[in-house]
Amino acid sequence: MKIRAQVENREGVHRVTLSTNQNVHAIDIPPKSSGFGSSANGGELLFLALATCYCNDVYREADRVGITVESVEVEVEGEFGGVGEPARNVRYRARVVARGTSEEEIRRLLQHTDTVAEVQNTLRGGVAVRLERVDVEVRG
């Protein structure tokens, strides 16, 4: 699975395009009220990635074991310090409503999902991130 995220920003414009393999879609995140940058910061989007990953993976893993999940709520919290500091004390909570199974089965499912959630495991593994290329245009 090849995943790509692209941001295009200039005064008053903020476009976000996401793709997984050949599936391309946009999400609406307005620019900052000052006109430059995103109204959602990177920390918020990182935590959104954690919440989204876990939510989607609960449905995926439930389907694998034949559990019918009706709804999932995930909330992620943490703190960022000063400029350049990584997040700390990142934690999340989930609430799941399911049919035709026991509370114990759901709890097992949720614990298992935590071990296979790819975004969580990426952060836990400390994957390397590198700046590959920079293009610059100087005007006037």
Kindly give the residue locations of the regions a language model identified.
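Extended beta-strand/beta-hairpin segments
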Residues: 1-48, 56-140
